Amino acid sequence: ESFDAFLATFTAEKRKKAKRERRRVAEAGIEFDTLHGGDMDDARWDAVYPFYADTFYRHGHEPYLNLDFFKRLAASMPDRIMLKVARIGRTPIAVAIFFVGSDALFGRYWGAGGNYHSLHFETCYYQGIEYCIDKKLQRFEPGTQGEHKVPRGFVPTLMSSAHFVADPRFAAAIRDFAAREARGVDSYAAAVNEHVPYHRAPDEELQL
């Protein structure tokens, strides 16, 4: 299995678009390093954390997780955290932070120090897909929401969640809303499925 074999499952139009996006990143002189927790010393974390934090600052929020959290996580779970660091020459320009499960890759955080055409798609999606192929992981979950993920190979997958309602007076209203919301989500997922890029079902589904 290879990335080209994966792209071969796309329609010609979608395959051409994905290749064009990857080519634009390469033509900009951008290269990628794959780093796991054990590869990340303080200097590397200090270099890439501002990219993660800036994603929150741009929307008027404080970062959910501080730098010390990531350093501690990498030290305690070195094989479970993976970073794709984009760079031009020796200078980092963007990072995507992933978590590695026994059979799945989970994409969670991203940030960049500038605007580069298609860099988000390459760093967060295409690089992750290549990693899954190389490591023979069965699933890649890049995070919730985002119609832009669909033409890049991710199909909508319905997920469940459980919630505790402390005040029983809210239970009926919440139950009614959840039932109506479920019907809407089913309809939306069916509509999105009409736009997946595959000309045949992929061997392993990538989850949206």
Residue spans for each PLM region:
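Acyl-donor binding region in acyl/amide transferases
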Residues: 102-168, 175
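A conserved beta-strand-loop-helix scaffold within acyl/acetyltransferase catalytic domains
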Residues: 1-118, 164, 179, 196-208
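C-terminal "cap" of GNAT-fold acetyltransferases
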Residues: 168-179, 195
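Short Fe-S-cluster ligation motifs
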Residues: 178-192
